[in-house]
Amino acid sequence: MEQQPSVPRSCTNVARETPMNLNIQSTTGTRYELSVPPDETVDGLKRRISQRLKVPKERLTLLHRETRLSSGKLQDLGISDGSRLTLLPSVEAGLMSQMSRPEQSVMQALESLTETQVNDFLSGRSPLTLALRVGDHMMFVQLQLAAQQSGASHLQHRHVITRGAEAGASPQYRTLHTSTSALSHLASCTPGSTPPTTLSPTASTHRDGPHSSPLTTSVFRSHGEGVAVSPCAEQVPCSSRGTEGTSSSASSRSRKPGAIIESFVNHAPGVFSGTFSGTLHPHCQDSAGRPRRDIGTILQILNDLLSATRHYQGMPPSLTTLRCHTQCASQARNPKATSPQSSEPQQTTHPVGHCQAQTRTCKPSGDRLRQTENRATRCKVERLQLLMHQKRLRRKARRDSRAPYHWMPTRKSSRTSSNSSTSSGEGSLEIDFEDSLWKPDVKAELNSEFVVA
């Protein structure tokens, strides 16, 4: 007798977990059914409808029994299984809708993504392409997160952790399979011919802080890992950069959530590419430290990347400059890794001298670009100074025109400044109009009428 009440309880639990079927009917005649969980909210229902209709959810209006649904849970509003909802289209016209669309373009694009697209992007299987319009400019942004690495890359990552621990970093790291600490980059290259000893012995990896943990599936890369990136097509081994001071400062910064732009390449006018690394914010992670598979995680990554542009120091190098530095670093590192300890010093100094010669050839391009920008800035400053000087002269002429004229030098200077400021054809401020307009035999009482003109 005591087991009978447990049967309806299990039935009610199953009934609560079963989704509700809602009949959506629009005013244009479209009808379809939509299955939602029992604890679905109005905002979530609008998001599901917007994903199906490819319409922003801000332009959707739902009615239930002639009552507009704005917020709250569906069960609290009296909506149950089999309820009928009316969908009203929101029509906008004029310039107001065009001005408000750019502010909501990113959020609308993220909300239109399906769960499969979000999972593929966060796991690194597919890139995320966004078309943004700022004023009259159209920008195409493509983000690619590196996929989860395994095998040799896992061993390589573990070797970096070991060498970083020998350099004095904290030994508390997370493995690659549970929650990675070495978060990978956009274009990763695998050094196949170089031994593991060519990696930087002073590279320190990410420390696990109490409030932040790195993103799973290698979405970002560790702040302290000082490894430069080279394209895989060139087959150039990854070169190490950074010293003990920079690695220790980077490891201290890596505890804070956020992103850091590590490389930035200018391929052509208006075409840029680069790599970034960082740590995901704690509110985008679940209780196990894994990232949440929703658009909030993508939005947080975009915000971190945008805020990282303010802290990015240095001018974006060109593609040839980056390749030159990569080749120089690889040539300077290979003799040290292959030559024995008793090798002659001439063999190690020759590639370094060759590297310096290559860097000298790479410097003029950056210096020429810097000189061009300095010249353009100087021209702008001189133009602004000229405009300010002309404005100052016009203000002085306007002020002198309303003042009484008791002295001859004041009257002559005011007329000269007014004539020089109003003349637009000459463009010179040193023209003397006294010889053509002023005659010494004219009386001063008659001049007071046409001096101001």
Curated annotation (Swiss-Prot):
Residues 188-204, 239-252, 415-428 have a biased composition (Low complexity). Residues 330-362 have a biased composition (Polar residues). SMART domains: UBQ (SM00213). SUPFAM superfamilies: Ubiquitin-like. Residues 20-94 form the Ubiquitin-like domain. Keywords: Cytoplasm, Nucleus. Residues 390-399 have a biased composition (Basic residues). It comes from the Eukaryota. Facilitates ubiquitin-independent proteasomal degradation of polycomb protein CBX4. Plays a role in inhibiting the activity of glucokinase GCK and both glucose-induced and basal insulin secretion. This is Midnolin. The gene is midn.
